[in-house]
Structure formats: structure tokens, C-alpha cells
């Protein structure tokens, strides 16, 4: 009888420990969420300026993400309304995330995303944090990619500001190239030190 009681307590203790370990692991990355919608065939961010720890002043507007000093984050972008009424359009899908404008005080031109003109040292910081797939365009490797959700990782080793550009495509029923839309707020990294 004592053995059964001890075994039961040990099992309950192990389950509690495993639950705590899973909960700690799940929250260790401090997930950030940005919500987007298609409004009149344009990609619009509906998250508030303060949803992801950005201050009201100098935040870069809706969709701004601040990762505090010493934190790491997974950034998830969700597309809520994906209706496409453009020529032969079917629906919008999230396609990619690009970074650019290293420490730029203003939003870079959409065609100027990437790190082709960024110093190697500064590019290395961004690449270590975000895992860049293509330096020239700033394309980021995703940790999750679905039709209405895309996720990227941010290790936040260094302090800097970088802008991100979300790409949504509207596939066409006629087989022609898809329609492409972008939205581009910023990420403010607090760094590890």
C-alpha cells in the first residue's frame, strides 16, 4: 500500500514538473502577435501601436514590435480577412517577411529592403537574431508558414531597430502572376546586454 502511495506521489510530482517545464519552454520565447487584414485589396495592420510593448511616441505606428532587453521572441503575423477581388483573384495568403532599414529613423522605401549596403558587422547582428535567408532582399527564414499565419524568430542579441515588410499574395485563377501587397512596420530590439 505504501509503495502504491509513493508511486502515485512520484507520478504526480513528475507530471507537475513536466507541466512546469513545458509551460516555461512555451513562454520562454515571449511571443509577439501582429494581426493583419485585407481591406479594399490592401494589406492593413489592425494591431494597436501598444500591443507589442512599443511606446506611443516614436513607435513606428501599428505593428511595431519591441523586444525588451534580455528577451527572445517569436513573432507571429496573422491574416484575418483574406478576400481578394482583384482581377481573377482567389484569396490572399501570407508569403514572406523581409527585413531592412538597419537603424533607420524612417520607413525605408519598399524596394530598398535588405542589407546589400549595410556593413558586414551590422548585417551579422541582424542575421544572428533573425536568420536571414537572402542578404540582398532581407528575406527571413520562417519558423512557421501557413496560408494565414507566418512566424519568424528573434534572438535579440544586439540593440538596434530594423523594419520588417510582410508580403501577401493574391493567387489568380487565370494562372498569371499573383497580385502582391506589402505592409511594413518596425522591430526595436533591446539586445542581450
Language model: regions and residue ranges:
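Beta-strand cores of secreted/periplasmic/IMS beta-sandwich domains, seen most often
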Residues: 65-88
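Bacterial N-terminal signal peptides that target proteins for export
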Residues: 2-14
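Extended low-complexity, serine/threonine- and proline-enriched intrinsically disordered segments
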Residues: 74, 86-120
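Extracellular/periplasmic metallocenter environments
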Residues: 122-193
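Signal peptide cleavage region of secreted peptide precursors
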Residues: 26-27
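N-terminal edge beta-strand
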Residues: 30-69
